[in-house]
Amino acid sequence: MLSPPTLRSRLAPGARPVFNQIPGVSRHGRAPTLALLEAHQAMAELLTIRDLHVRFSKGNGRLVFALNGISLRAREGEVVGILGESGSGKSTLAKALLRLLPRTAHVAGDIQFVGRNTLQLSECEMNQIRGARIALIPQEPGLALNPVLKIGDQVAEVLRVHRDWNWKRCKAEAQSALEQVGLLAGAGRRFYDAYPHQLSGGQQQRAVIAQALVCEPALIIADEPTASLDTATEAQILDLFRELRAGRSSSLLFITHNPDLLRNFADRVAVLYAGRVVETKSVDSLFENTRHPYAKGLLACVPAQAAKLALGERLHTIGGMPADAETPTRGCSFAPRCNERLDKCETQHPEMQEVNDAEAVECFLYGG
């Protein structure tokens, strides 16, 4: 009987997993040539989004401006946090990457995934990518799972669609995938044969994570995967993501409204507001030296900051109302809520400015 292959990267006995190493660099630290560095950078670029716009038609000539020129990249093995409040465009971005937007959506821009513009692919070609090369972990696992099918069969079905395997092997792989995410057989119960309503919220989330990982995709999009979970279960799921990250080269876009979830987890963070990336930086720099006024306000709002407040002092909030997606502004979208705005912020839109090699901010305060 065939033993089900593990979901983790295949390594020779005694070999150590190696990620993000530059070809030409020896174990003894010999420096590579500039050509090798450039070749590695091109090879490591997995996803590149350039000037992505998404608008929805609402009838009567009205439009909703959901994404307004997003540019973003993700390299192989990198965890990129997508941070923003409700309505900032996070979930629209996830659906745009998978081409799952409704027919009312008008999409423009460029999405390069492993060198191919996914916006120009046929639906048949896109079906070969969804679930196999790019996988989605939704924020509502209870709605994503089919209530009348066994959990294991739903994971196995992903393999049946994308692999030329018989059903027996698909089931064996699915069982292995469930075990990888902590849904272990035993105690008189097999999670493979359970139905969604028989699982807790955390177990359902583990099941959809198994669905996403079973084909070993190059890119995983986690759309607020802990939003519907209690605090204890949320911590368990985050620990699971950290464990799964070790030993695999998949890239992860982790979408959240909570900056604390990205701490000690993400490599880089892109902060979204009104359908635009307003700041990108390393996760350490995000907590130590945030620049954009919206990003600073968002960090000040998280519950973890409550411990720093004096007795009777109120938790910080961002004043004003979020930007109206149906009414695009002439200037900076955050200007009506910004305490640091300049006169030109009302009438001109800042450009993204590189602060250094790892950081960029869209704000006139930094030369935008």
Feature locations, PLM:
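Conserved ABC transporter NBD signature motif
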Residues: 106-117
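Charged, flexible cofactor/metal-binding loops and thiol motifs
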Residues: 1-40, 188-189, 282-368
